[in-house]
Amino acid sequence: MEYNKVIKNINNYFFNLSVIKYIFFILILSYVVFLPFGFLFNNYEYDIGGPQSIINASFLGKIFIGSLLAPIFETFVFQYIPIELLDKIKIKKNKDFFVLIISSLFFSLTHTYSLIYVLYTFVMGIFLSYTYILYKKKNFHPFWIVVIIHSLRNTITTFILFLF
């Protein structure tokens, strides 16, 4: 099976998933993809860093900032603005791929706490940008679907870090 056909089949599969199933799938996938990065964090970096305002915040502060404010702000800045602007450019071939990479690159370059974290957030940026593009094509609230995924991801991670 050729590469373009595989991509098209995957895209069709995601397009036909219900919103709840898609969100669940992307959340699970985001943690599966994190596994090799987790190995790198544990073996090569003791602290990935992060913004001091979040590191020093209380648990509720971390939830408020990381699960509400950051996802809304970052979705607006790193998915909505670049994707909507780049969507207006007349590119005939692989436009979605180009837009996805640019948006993901912007997202990852603002998470420069460590090189490994930049690489990990680039992959997360691909998931979030893909989601925005997909739900824009479905004409079903792409901004809020991305915010929900990002919020859930950050909330789950905050609870995991709090418990362990």
Language-model features: locations:
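Juxtamembrane helix-loop-helix connectors linking adjacent transmembrane helices
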Residues: 2-70, 83-89
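Transmembrane helix-loop-helix hairpins at the membrane interface
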Residues: 31, 35, 63-164
